[in-house]
Structures are given as C-alpha cells and as structure tokens.
C-alpha cells in the first residue's frame, strides 16, 4: 500500500516541520542521481542515467528524468538539460504565489556510484552542468539575472568495506543494542580517524539491520556553494532523508532521492530491453555514431511511453517507485 499510494500521488510521510526548518533551508530542491551499467561483457547495451528532484516542501515527491549513456560512462552526459527540466518542474509545481518564491534558492545534490578516483572529474563536469542549467533557465525564462542557487554537492558511496560494532566492556551489551545482532544504532556516525582530515567526510549507519551486519554508507562533500556549511546540518538532513523512502516506514540505508534515482535507472533499462538488438555495434563503427543510434532508439521509447502514459505520468510523477 505504501508503494501504491506514492505511485498515485499520495504522501505517506514527511519531515516534521520543526526538524525541516531547523536543518533544511526554505526553497530547497534536493536531487539524487545514479547511473546503471550493462552486465559484464555486454557491448551492445548502453548505460542509463537517472536524476530525481524534489518539488514539494515535505521532500516526499520527486520528479524523474533519464538519458542513455555510452557503456561504462559514469559522468552524466546530459545533466544540464536534465537539471533544466527539474528546475522548470519545481517552478511550475510550487505552492508559492509570488514568481520569485517559486524558484529554488538552494540545491542539494546527492550523487551515487562514484569512486574516489572520479571525484575530481565528477565535480568539474557535473557541477558545471548544474550551474550552466541554472544560468540558461534564468536567461530563457527571464528569471532574475542573479538566479544562482547555492549548490551543495555530495557523493554517496554505498559499497565500502567499513563495518562498525558497539564497544561492549565486560561483554555487556550496550543499551538499545540487540544482543543477537550486535549492530550499532540507526543514526550512528563516524567522522574522525578513518575519514578525511579536513573535508566533510563521514560514515552513516541510517538503517536498522534486521539480519546480518549493518553496512554504512559513506558521504563526501565535494562542493558547498562557497559558504561555510554546517556539518551537523548535513549529517542530520542526510539521516532524515533516509526516513522518506516511500516503500518503507523505517529508515533505509541511504537517502530517498538517491534510492529513487537507482530505481528509475533500473526501470528505464527495462523499458529499453531488446530495443538495441538491431543496432550495429561492431568494432569498426565509430563510437559516436553508435551512441547516436542508441539515443534515437531511446527517444522513440520515451516518445512511446509519454504517448501511452502522458496523462498518468502528469498526474502521478512518482510512478517509477
């Protein structure tokens, strides 16, 4: 029922107003991004990028868009256009009355699936794409010239080898810890010793692991918009976003917008199943030419989806959950 309600435009839960106003500034758009890749050995299937963005004050509803990518390409190639679509969707669905209050003043971007060696490239290319999107939307739709949302860019790393256990002096189980599991409590944070010495870098165990050992997610701040951002606010905002995943009434292992981006990328991969079988991907063909053929095929898939489901998608933008 939780999933169905979210698909049909309902709200399962949201931020407590006091918590929301304490840790998230007004007119904030929270985005999540992920790229799904083909299986090992697949040469005739591209990667798919999906980006989600909140458009309500409860940070429960997220608009989604997607693009095809060259195989194994982690940098989101068309992030600028995708961000422009999200900015316009946020503006058109804002509950504010004044036009200047319908534009996001802050953007928090959670980027999934990036390794340490890709940090510099992702920051250089994807951050620039978001900034260019804001600039072009402001110019095209005659928003104020100084429309420059403050961007907070965070990387989410789900796959890591860190595991944490509560200290048990004299073999006594600490209060609140299940003796059968031995996991730390939900909300446990490690931000010293094994993290970066001066950048905002922390591990967060946000979920209650029912079985086995809880796996933490690691978060690294790559850009803070030129302002001295409060580290505690980032940690709490990240933790609370883990409670807003529509399918579950408990906290999950990483923030809902990133989770949704992962679901969306997997869904569009199914949309395009068997759509690339007739495309020549032999070694002799130019890679750009192959990519254009892939893009044309996915454009047809997108057109068919919109044609068949336009009214449903317009009324239920979270159909992909």
Predicted regions and their residues:
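Long, contiguous domain-sized segments
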Residues: 1-321
